[in-house]
Amino acid sequence: MNTATGVIALLVLATVIGCIEAEDTRADLQGGEAAEKVFRRSPTCIPSGQPCPYNENCCSKSCTYKENENGNTVQRCD
């Protein structure tokens, strides 16, 4: 087997292995097991004193308007 044939054989093997692995982690739009493999969300929350867009993102579950260092009123987690 010469060098060109060896390179072609390796490319074919790599393509086949890549397709098999891609099938295992394919996104499942129905929210099944494959979706759990691809999208892993860790429960995170915004700590106290940080800007908050929504109450549910704060660790304290509470967000109030406060004055910042520039004198502007912004929402911050309690």
From Swiss-Prot:
Stretches that traverse the bilayer: none
Disulfide pattern: 45-59, 52-63, 58-77
GO BP: defense response
Expressed in which tissues: Expressed by the venom gland.
GO molecular function list: calcium channel inhibitor activity; sodium channel regulator activity; toxin activity
DNA-binding is among the record's keywords: no
SUPFAM superfamilies, alphabetized: omega toxin-like (SSF57059)
PROSITE patterns per record: OMEGA_ACTX_1
Pfam families, alphabetized: Omega-toxin
UniProt GO cellular component terms: extracellular region
Keywords assigned: Calcium channel impairing toxin, Cleavage on pair of basic residues, Disulfide bond, Ion channel impairing toxin, Knottin, Neurotoxin, Secreted, Signal, Toxin, Voltage-gated calcium channel impairing toxin, Voltage-gated sodium channel impairing toxin
Site (Critical for insecticidal activity): 51, 68, 76
Prosegment location in residue numbers: 23-41
Cleaved signal peptide residues: 1-22
Entry's localization field: Secreted
Additional record remark: This toxin comes from a male specimen. It is observed that propeptide sequences coming from male specimen are identical but have only limited homology with the female paralogs, but the reason is unknown.
Protein purpose: Insecticidal toxin that reversibly and voltage-independently blocks both mid-low- (M-LVA) and high-voltage-activated (HVA) calcium channels (Cav) in cockroach DUM neurons. Also causes a modest block of insect sodium channel currents (Nav). Induces potent excitatory symptoms, followed by flaccid paralysis leading to death in house crickets.
Record note on domains: The presence of a 'disulfide through disulfide knot' structurally defines this protein as a knottin.
Similarity comment: Belongs to the neurotoxin 08 (Shiva) family. 01 (omega toxin) subfamily.
Name of the protein described by the UniProt record: Omega-hexatoxin-Ar1e
Species the sequence originates in: Atrax robustus (Sydney funnel-web spider)
